């Protein structure tokens, strides 16, 4: 299952001071706000965006296990971004059991694919499996 996407867009520049919230040279809060808005239009509910040292974390409402989209500017040109799901594989280990996350990940990645492909300002979209 492909749960990581890289793309280019000048649509998501950093906010002033954003790099102090995470790390120098990294940003993506505008991208996460965009995903929150677009996911909501598709009936996928999210929670408050969280700053991480590598970028931004969007918790997705889900029962049974943690589900999220992680996004940020990728090292390189100012228009390079990467997003991946958490979890990155369809099997979630929780305590002593395994949970099949295929349905939830499929719904989330399909929504992400639709959002990215529908926007003409987002280019060079490449999906990859977990690394």
Spans of features found by a protein language model:
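N-terminal low-complexity, intrinsically disordered segments
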Residues: 1-36, 40, 44
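Acidic, low-complexity intrinsically disordered regions
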Residues: 23, 50-52, 123
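Short linear interaction motif-like sites in intrinsically disordered regions of transcription factors
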Residues: 28, 55-57, 128
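Short, intrinsically disordered low-complexity segments
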Residues: 33-67
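A domain-level signal for the structural core that forms small-molecule/cofactor-binding pockets
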Residues: 36, 93-96, 130-131
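Amphipathic protein-protein interaction modules
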Residues: 54-108
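Intrinsically disordered, low-complexity regulatory regions enriched in serine/threonine/proline
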Residues: 101-131
